[in-house]
């Protein structure tokens, strides 16, 4: 069997970190200064709902809960099994703690949220070691080259997908490395309710804290 480079597998594995979720650019403005007198429990509840929706992965619903209804993209396609496995493992890992009180600002309030979650970059780094090993193992299990290569002697997409699926399962079976980040969320009054502003900091969280 002709010896093949591992670069296609390594690039595919490394590329997972860039595909955590495609977040559209959020454009938001300001609104008039709200009254300082407010029920902070309402602010905490609005933030809790946003965090819960974010963890569910339903970004279409989440968009409607954010100020300006930003386009949050389509997220990870479920058909891309390896990416989907990593993304939903990340979502399942998310936990958070809200600060007890918010801080008034000219346009609303801010509230600190401490997030603990799986480190996606640690998983994709592990894949760069695991994937070549799984490729060699799976290649040895095949009885025909046609199960690995196409007519142009390139890896078959289904073989690459099988390698990444198996490698991802192995990577996710390991005890996860966790991140802890504290975000300062901004909330403003709109349409009679408190809404979280889609700041860059929030977008970073919604994309899995990748590329830090």
Give each language-model segment a name:
Residues 32-103, 122:
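Core segments of small alpha/beta cavity-forming domains
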Residues 100-110, 187-193:
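A short, structured loop/turn motif at beta-sheet edges
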Residues 57-61, 118-120, 193-195, 203:
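Primarily extracytoplasmic ectodomains and periplasmic/lumenal surface modules that are beta-strand-rich
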Residues 132-158, 171-212:
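Short beta-strand edge/turn micro-motifs at domain boundaries
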Residues 66-68, 100-102, 113-119, 198-202:
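A mature extracytoplasmic/lumenal domain signature
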Residues 1-65, 109-113:
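Gram-positive cell-envelope targeting signals
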Residues 116-134:
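Short, cysteine-centered beta-strand-loop-beta hairpins and adjacent loop/turn segments enriched
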Residues 80-84, 162-170:
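Short Pro/Gly-enriched beta-strand edge/turn motifs at strand-loop
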């Amino acid at each position: 069997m002709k010896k093949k480079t591992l670069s296609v597998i390594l690039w595919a594995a490394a590329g997972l970190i860039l595909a955590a979720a495609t977040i559209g650019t959020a454009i938001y403005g300001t609104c008039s200064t709200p009254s300082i007198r407010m029920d902070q429990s309402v602010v905490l509840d609005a933030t809790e709902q946003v965090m819960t929706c974010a963890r569910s992965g339903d970004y279409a619903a989440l968009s409607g809960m954010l100020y300006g209804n930003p386009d949050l993209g389509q997220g990870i396609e479920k058909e891309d099994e390896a990416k989907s496995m990593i993304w939903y493992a990340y979502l399942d890992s998310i936990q958070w703690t809200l600060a007890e009180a918010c801080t008034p600002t000219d346009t609303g309030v801010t509230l600190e949220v401490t997030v603990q979650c799986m480190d996606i970059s640690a998983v994709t780094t592990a894949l760069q070691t695991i994937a070549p090993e799984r490729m060699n193992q799976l290649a040895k299990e095949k009885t025909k080259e046609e199960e690995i290569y196409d007519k142009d002697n390139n890896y078959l997409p289904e073989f690459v997908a099988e390698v990444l699926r198996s490698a991802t399962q192995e990577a996710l079976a390991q005890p996860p490395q966790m991140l802890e980040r504290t975000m300062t969320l901004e909330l403003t009054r709109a349409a009679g309710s408190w809404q979280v502003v889609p700041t860059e900091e929030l977008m970073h969280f919604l994309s899995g804290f990748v590329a830090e």
